[in-house]
């Protein structure tokens, strides 16, 4: 198999899914953000966004922190070092293929 094409088969399946790719790309550009900001930027509904975040958290790519601002609940999200490394590796493999 062509080495460039082999790189496609080796892409991180967790990140490669379009919804999760958008989430990871957005999170890579910031230190952290809250759930509502991410929902607004991705245009994903709450359930879909929560599902994608759970999968990313399971892979140790995203850290989810539940806090309160006064009495209002707030969910903060950030990429972990492993998540940043995985996204950078994904980007490098995509560059090699394209």
Across the structure, where does each feature detected by a protein language model lie?
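Short beta-strand "wing" residues that participate in macromolecule-binding interfaces
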Residues: 64
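Amphipathic alpha-helical dimerization/coiled-coil segments
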Residues: 1-8, 25-26, 84-98
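Residues within the DNA-recognition helix of helix-turn-helix
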Residues: 52
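N-terminal helix-turn-helix DNA-binding core of bacterial DNA-binding proteins
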Residues: 6-48, 69-71, 76-78
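Accessory beta->alpha helical hairpin/"wing" motif in late/C-terminal subdomains of nucleic-acid enzymes
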Residues: 79-83
């Amino acid at each position: 198999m062509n080495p460039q094409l082999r790189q496609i088969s080796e892409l991180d399946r967790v990140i490669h899914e379009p919804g999760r790719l958008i989430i990871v790309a957005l999170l890579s550009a910031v230190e952290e953000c809250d759930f509502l900001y991410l929902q607004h930027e991705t245009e994903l509904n709450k359930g879909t966004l929560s599902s994608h975040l759970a999968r990313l958290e399971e892979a140790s790519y995203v850290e989810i922190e539940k806090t309160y601002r006064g009495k209002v609940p707030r969910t903060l999200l950030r990429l972990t070092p492993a998540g940043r490394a995985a996204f950078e590796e994904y980007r490098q493999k995509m560059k090699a293929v394209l």
